[in-house]
């Protein structure tokens, strides 16, 4: 159903996934397995299911309580949900979320991991010294590319995300499937280790809780369910049906924490 907005529901979903699928799905999963063991993956799945319900309310409320920016364009987000849903007396919390959200969405970790990956895969094998100047140049390049995208506003971000994200996820899936096919005989052992570690009686209640907390924390960090960032994208959707937009938003954690993180975990456990 067409309504007031700037982008389609699909573009909103792809933009939300674009902000979550990335370095966290690789480095975050590796950290979760290192700290919590293979069982952390099971609790990431559980957290993904819980995150889907949270994302439903984010998407639905973003459509129910839209606002307009200074240019008169329809916008959505947690700040508008607080302002229009809870009332004027909660307005300070809307400002608080806007400021904290701006700080929390800084891409410091992602940029650092991207530079580390480039230097490890490309520059170091080529004999290029990993200096501060090289990292600075890479940072400038990343800033220019990102700046070229976000300068076009939410419309350009959504259009580019809708084109890149499906290709990115599909290519990642195909590469992982190749690894899994080459190591098919090890998959039963990997699955067994995940469930055994998740409910290991040898580790005791403390060990199970530690594994569960590690998996849940990493999943929440990766899919951003409940953080409030996805509502900004879904609030800009032209869809005027809150329930339908909420159902679309639920796909995000399923792809992010459910699919991509699992595809990352299996090769790590096989190795």
Residue ranges, per PLM feature:
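Hydrophobic, small-residue-rich membrane helices and short re-entrant helix-turn-helix hairpins
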Residues: 78, 149-166, 186-192, 223-255
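Membrane-interface loop-to-helix entry segments
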Residues: 115-118, 134-182, 187, 191-195
């Amino acid at each position: 159903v067409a309504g007031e907005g700037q982008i389609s529901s699909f573009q909103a979903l792809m933009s939300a996934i674009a902000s979550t699928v990335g370095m966290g799905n690789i480095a975050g999963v590796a950290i979760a397995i290192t700290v919590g063991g293979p069982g952390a993956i099971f609790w990431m799945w559980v957290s993904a299911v819980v995150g889907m319900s949270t994302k439903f309310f984010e998407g639905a409320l973003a459509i129910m309580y839209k606002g307009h920016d200074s240019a008169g364009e329809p916008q959505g987000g947690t700040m508008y949900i607080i302002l229009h849903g809870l009332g004027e007396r909660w307005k300070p919390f809307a400002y608080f979320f806007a400021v904290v959200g701006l700080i929390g969405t800084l891409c410091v970790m992602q940029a650092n991991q991207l530079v580390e990956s480039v230097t490890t895969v490309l520059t170091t094998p080529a004999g290029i010294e990993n200096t501060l100047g090289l990292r600075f140049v890479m940072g400038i390049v990343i800033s220019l590319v990102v700046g070229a995208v976000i300068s076009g506003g939410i419309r350009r971000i959504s259009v580019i995300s809708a084109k890149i994200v499906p290709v990115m996820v599909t290519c990642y899936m195909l590469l992982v499937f190749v690894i899994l096919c080459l190591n098919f005989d090890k998959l039963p052992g990997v699955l067994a280790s995940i469930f055994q570690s998740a409910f290991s009686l040898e580790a005791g209640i403390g060990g199970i809780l530690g594994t569960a907390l590690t998996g849940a924390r990493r999943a929440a960090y990766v899919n951003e369910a409940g953080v409030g960032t996805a509502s900004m994208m879904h609030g800009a959707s032209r869809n005027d049906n809150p329930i339908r937009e909420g159902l679309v938003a639920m796909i995000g954690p399923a792809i992010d924490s459910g699919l991509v993180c699992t595809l990352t975990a299996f090769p790590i456990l096989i190795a």
